[in-house]
From Swiss-Prot:
Residues 8-83 form the KRAB domain. Coiled coil: none annotated. The keyword Repeat applies. PROSITE patterns: KRAB, ZINC_FINGER_C2H2_1, ZINC_FINGER_C2H2_2. It holds the Pfam family zf-C2H2. May be involved in transcriptional regulation. SMART domains: KRAB, ZnF_C2H2. GO terms for molecular function: DNA binding; zinc ion binding. This is Zinc finger protein 836. Keywords: DNA-binding, Metal-binding, Nucleus, Repeat, Transcription, Transcription regulation, Zinc, Zinc-finger. The keyword Zinc applies. InterPro entries: C2H2-ZF_domain, KRAB, KRAB_dom_sf, Znf_C2H2_sf, Znf_C2H2_type.
Amino acid sequence: MALTQGPLTFRDVAIEFSQEEWKSLDPVQKALYWDVMLENYRNLVFLGILPKCMTKELPPIGNSNTGEKCQTVTLERHECYDVENFYLREIQKNLQDLEFQWKDGEINYKEVPMTYKNNLNGKRGQHSQEDVENKCIENQLTLSFQSRLTELQKFQTEGKIYECNQSEKTVNNSSLVSPLQRILPSVQTNISKKYENEFLQLSLPTQLEKTHIREKPYMCKGCGKAFRVSSSLINHQMVHTTEKPYKCNECGKAFHRGSLLTIHQIVHTRGKPYQCGVCGKIFRQNSDLVNHRRSHTGEKPYKCNECGKSFSQSYNLAIHQRIHTGEKPYKCNECGKTFKQGSCLTTHQIIHTGEKPYQCDICGKVFRQNSNLVNHQRIHTGEKPYKCNICGKSFSQSSNLATHQTVHSGNKPYKCDECGKTFKRSSSLTTHQIIHTGEKPYTCDVCDKVFSQRSQLARHQRSHTGEKPYKCNECGKVFSQTSHLVGHRRIHTGEKPYKCDKCGKAFKQGSLLTRHKIIHTREKRYQCGECGKVFSENSCLVRHLRIHTGEQPYKCNVCGKVFNYSGNLSIHKRIHTGEKPFQCNECGTVFRNYSCLARHLRIHTGQKPYKCNVCGKVFNDSGNLSNHKRIHTGEKPFQCNECGKVFSYYSCLARHRKIHTGEKPYKCNDCGKAYTQRSSLTKHLIIHTGEKPYNCNEFGGAFIQSSKLARYHRNPTGEKPHKCSHCGRTFSHITGLTYHQRRHTGEMPYKCIECGQVFNSTSNLARHRRIHTGEKPYKCNECGKVFRHQSTLARHRSIHTGEKPYVCNECGKAFRVRSILVNHQKMHTGDKPYKCNECGKAFIERSKLVYHQRNHTGEKPYKCIECGKAFGRFSCLNKHQMIHSGEKPYKCNECGKSFISRSGLTKHQTKHTAESLKTKFNVEKPLDVLLTSGFK
């Protein structure tokens, strides 16, 4: 589809002839020329593109020998915007003088008569009536301007008409020059010749004639434009159908009408005498060559007095000055919106018609303007013809280059009158000003959401359609926005073009650099009204407020799960699709989002850039550092709406909520077991597969969990370099030593809010809290019994299997749990590291010391809800509560009798043992038999 690009001027559609060329045309061609040029002018005026200059020359008519007079008509409008001058020039050979008269509304004007071989350059009313002589011209030339009355009134109130500059217009000695009424839009010029002794009269039509002229019975259904004759309507409709049946054999250009093709073909038959010495381009007029040369020289002779900006063309300066004056002379009849340029109005009017005639051949996308199509096609071709002379960066659009160059210059000429903020582009200023007005004229048809910019609406609509037209050539990933594709490509290239002036850190995106700079300035302007927390960006505050409101506006279409951030929803959807687009080059592990890959890469590098200012602990992720700091501050911003419990982390709150809902969304397909967390399901699945997906390429080990791989990477040899100065025990990690030393020092920094009990680690505190919440997330598959701790469940499972893997080397006794073996071994060594400060009694286990100390303090923190009785140990409370519930979980296999405690069952089972011995040895005292026989 051959369509023109850019704003159209009258020069683009005008064909000019020299005297020799004009003589070579036959009368039919001359008549055709007049008709076409007049029609072109009408069309330009209708589109709001007012030509700078239009010249019509009527060649000499007749022969002076036969009594006919030769005459030439020239209509010209100068470039100045507030003055439009038209001139009539008539060459006279046999006349002595001339009187000239025209009407302007109800006022008559007369010009001074002119004698033969004299010039007349007059203004309206400049000459007196006495100067007018009685002898008149033999022929009459009448120009009738047909227009609407409202348009006539509009033009009559504007400006003034003044004489032609003689330095620009050369007039023959035997010619008359006089300003005429300006030509109005939709003008029609009727030229007639009479051989009578009358004044030369230029008149406007009467009101009756205007009524008759306005009748246009043929209307276009596409745009509503009306025509007087049906042939004009047929020609016009080709604009909508884009049909161009008339094609030039020379260059292939197509036209709606045959007459336009005829005029166009003259271009090929005549020369272009003005050639550029730099690039060889040729032009028909010298003025065009002069303007073109400025593109090579960079000359910008037209300077703005307000801001000093320079331009190569005067009309560009005139348009620019409207920024300062605020003038917007072009108004849309549909919505009343005004524009600085007629071309902008033309572009805007397509919004109302919905017409998008320009289509991309590759992806089928349609556009309102050809320039937009050309820019769009560069996405497919990758063409970037505009290069920055300073840094060499290339761009697909000249506007992007202009915007980029302001980075080097720092120039921000566009200032907001409301708040004083400055911008590099006028479009950015226009967008910014909507913040003050609050205007959001663009509405989504699907969800009725409103936007301040059309581009924002277009981006939003892709969330409904799912359209992702921008594809990465490296990995095939698709995106809904070009900016996302550009940012994504930097993952492959490693490019980080945005550098911080303060610390030198580089970023892939400008927005990340802006966010980073706030670290140096510490500027946080947006404060939360609920908790007082401040943020550097309003978007961060909006996201934070959802924590308090519980708003989760983003819903998964597959499982119905809701999220408070759109990014979280996008990552969640990959669970259903199985997509893991981010792969580690070191070990081949794949991830659903880039942040997980970035964190994982630090396992290989060992990098931990985030350090706690309080305790010096380092982290490989900023989120982990933020979470860690809450240990010191005690901050718990996440509260459960059901029970009011508060949490330090949102993940803990989400996990806790499932206690109330009973939700277990993660189900094993093999055995049907369900879990509240996906990580728990992942760990469980390894039981069935036996898979160890986390491989160490350095030392060859394989692990079930990534955390174990990370732990192994930190200490692959199993070395324990960290030694306790109190007891000599060694640890592989400093954290293990830190927790251990608290046993000696008695430091317990973690306190339970419910009962005040203190603990030396967060994990112990977390386990303890389940006592108050009643949470028992670990269930036995064999008997259905639930437990608060995973270790307790593991210990319980050995009851069913009978497995006792931990054997004492001293006495050979076996145990189900390693911790019990450790405590047992202290009986052989006599080691009792936990000593009571009150009475000096020592204990093997710290828990025994804690229980013992309650004898001195009288503390009984565990209280029965039923009867109010308090206990020093939780196990005692458990046993007591069975009295109220009637539960007896320990059953004797011999007689079926049940007991509240294991000790009660053990005591009971000795009765059966004694009875069997009594029967076997037939004695009354089986204990004596046991002592003498040694249990044989």
